[in-house]
């Protein structure tokens, strides 16, 4: 009987701990990163053909090497954060309006990006964020000018975005 009560008290105590205490620490983030990026890639594969086949603006590239350079630069964290916000707040909500059959996959992608953004915020001492990005300003302006085609372009290039995130986080991991 006493062991049962102790087990119940331990369970209750664990349930009242803040959520961040139950999550992996920031020190293990770099070890968990490959799996998180793989999950993003697998989920994107479910919708990739839909968006890339509707991208008629093949002479325009939203996610250029200039963005990757910013990700790798001094203020890479800010660029990554802005791009995560761009996809979660602008691209994915509008993309969900284009296809009812892909909403689950897009919702899952959004949740994965939000989780990555939350981890970066929680582990802020590893990621210094402080400056606005010129490349992202250009991306957003081009995206808006393209209207609905911008959705297909941004979602069609989502794999490039994942690769850039990976480059940034692997670079941070080496430091």
From Swiss-Prot:
The keyword Ribosomal protein does not apply. Keywords: Cytokine, Disulfide bond, Secreted, Signal. Its main location: secreted. One of its GO terms (molecular function) is cytokine activity. It is found in: Secreted. Residues 1-21 form the signal peptide. GO terms for biological process: cellular response to hepatocyte growth factor stimulus; cellular response to lipopolysaccharide; chronic inflammatory response to antigenic stimulus; defense response to bacterium; defense response to protozoan; immune response; interleukin-10-mediated signaling pathway; negative regulation of autophagy. The keyword Transport does not apply. Expressed predominantly in bursa of Fabricius and cecal tonsils with low levels in thymus, liver and lung. InterPro entries: 4_helix_cytokine-like_core, IL-10, IL-10/19/20/24/26. Disulfide bonds join 26-123, 77-129. SMART domains: IL10. GO terms for cellular component: extracellular region; extracellular space. Coiled coil: none annotated. Induction: By lipopolysaccharide (LPS) in white blood cells, liver and spleen 3 hours after treatment. Decreases to basal levels 8 hours after treatment. By primary infection with E.acervulina and E.tenella. Chickens susceptible to E.maxima infection show higher constitutive and post-infection levels in spleen and higher post-infection levels in small intestine than infection-resistant animals. Major immune regulatory cytokine that acts on many cells of the immune system where it has profound anti-inflammatory functions, limiting excessive tissue disruption caused by inflammation. Mechanistically, IL10 binds to its heterotetrameric receptor comprising IL10RA and IL10RB leading to JAK1 and STAT2-mediated phosphorylation of STAT3. In turn, STAT3 translocates to the nucleus where it drives expression of anti-inflammatory mediators. Homodimer. Interacts with IL10RA and IL10RB. Belongs to the IL-10 family. This is Interleukin-10. It comes from Gallus gallus (Chicken).
